[in-house]
């Protein structure tokens, strides 16, 4: 390990609050409402739609686009592809969250078609999803990673393969630009006891991506998640109260980031 990277997390969070970016979510039906609540809690503005008829228009007005394939359907898939092509054409910052990639042929084909557009400057997923995108074998059950090869190597490979920033989330989070790999060891174990926490990370990344470059956006978002999870866990009795407290704590942090400390990223030798 060597020294941590220079990322001004507090300044990035302040910019999100001051600019109130519009984040276009094309996301799954399980986490959609909470992602909208979270977007508002951190000072940004959400718009949620899976309609192919308005996808291009939504991309045009958005400051960042998040495509999450968690609950695919024919209509949603067409909308996502339309949005990806439009984001590429307009140069809008876009994130792909390939939820459950590898679980079915439908998800594999959809993700491959989305990546072929070249629209995504940031790809995030859990260790299993990122490992499969890297070309490694890993078992995926539902949308949870069951087992994977080292996520750090997988993140670096995906970043190189798709010319993007890649983030692999898990007990340890890894972010890579294809040359360097950074690790963050901070998330509380209760994040694995609630559905949608990975989707929340996508929302945070999209909000940050609207005001900064992909690498600091991913790192700032995951640092916020890590810091908030530790504070929220101290104030909670279990996963249920923890889930609610996460929204309150992330609101408090983004309103006054200088009053909080954030977990530190480290540069790995991979």
Swiss-Prot record:
Annotated metabolic or biological route of this protein: Cofactor biosynthesis; thiamine diphosphate biosynthesis; 4-methyl-5-(2-phosphoethyl)-thiazole from 5-(2-hydroxyethyl)-4-methylthiazole: step 1/1
SUPFAM superfamilies found in the cross-reference section: Ribokinase-like
The UniProt record lists the keyword Kinase: yes
EC number: 2.7.1.50
Top-level taxon in the UniProt lineage: Bacteria
GO biological process, any: thiamine diphosphate biosynthetic process
Gene3D superfamilies: 3.40.1190.20
Keywords: ATP-binding, Kinase, Magnesium, Metal-binding, Nucleotide-binding, Thiamine biosynthesis, Transferase
GO molecular function: ATP binding; hydroxyethylthiazole kinase activity; magnesium ion binding
Pfam families: HK
Binding annotation for ATP: 124, 169
Protein residues bound to substrate: 48, 196
Essential cofactor(s): Mg(2+)
UniProt cross-references to CDD domains, sorted A to Z: THZ_kinase
Record flagged with keyword Protein biosynthesis: no
Residues spanning the membrane: none
InterPro entries, alphabetized: Hyethyz_kinase, Ribokinase-like
Catalysed reactions listed for this entry: 5-(2-hydroxyethyl)-4-methylthiazole + ATP = 4-methyl-5-(2-phosphooxyethyl)-thiazole + ADP + H(+)
HAMAP family: Thz_kinase (MF_00228)
Function in brief: Catalyzes the phosphorylation of the hydroxyl group of 4-methyl-5-beta-hydroxyethylthiazole (THZ).
Annotated family: Belongs to the Thz kinase family.
Name of this chain's protein: Hydroxyethylthiazole kinase
The encoding gene: thiM
């Amino acid at each position: 390990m060597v020294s941590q990277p220079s990322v001004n997390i507090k300044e990035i969070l302040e910019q999100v609050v001051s600019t109130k970016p519009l984040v276009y979510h094309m996301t799954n039906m399980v986490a959609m409402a909470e992602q909208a609540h979270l977007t508002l809690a951190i000072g940004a503005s959400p718009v949620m739609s899976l309609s192919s008829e308005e996808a291009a228009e939504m991309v045009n007005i958005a400051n960042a686009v998040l495509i999450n394939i968690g609950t695919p359907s024919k209509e949603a898939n067409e909308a996502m592809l339309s949005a990806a092509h439009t984001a590429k054409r307009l140069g809008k910052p876009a994130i792909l969250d390939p939820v459950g990639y590898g679980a079915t042929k439908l998800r594999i084909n959809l993700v491959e078609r989305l990546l072929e557009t070249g629209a995504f400057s940031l790809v995030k997923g859990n260790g299993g999803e990122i490992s499969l995108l890297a070309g490694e074998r890993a078992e995926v059950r539902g949308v949870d990673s069951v087992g994977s090869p080292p996520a750090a190597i997988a993140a670096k490979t995906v970043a190189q393969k798709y010319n993007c920033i890649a983030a692999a989330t898990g007990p340890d989070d890894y972010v890579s630009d294809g040359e360097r790999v950074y690790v963050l060891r901070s998330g509380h174990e209760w994040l694995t006891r609630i559905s949608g926490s990975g989707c929340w990370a996508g929302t945070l990344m999209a909000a940050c991506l609207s005001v900064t470059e992909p690498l600091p956006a991913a790192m700032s978002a995951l640092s916020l998640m890590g810091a908030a999870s530790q504070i929220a866990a101290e104030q909670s009795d279990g996963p249920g109260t923890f889930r609610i407290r996460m929204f309150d704590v992330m609101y408090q942090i983004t309103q006054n980031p200088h009053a909080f400390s954030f977990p530190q990223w480290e540069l790995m030798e991979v």
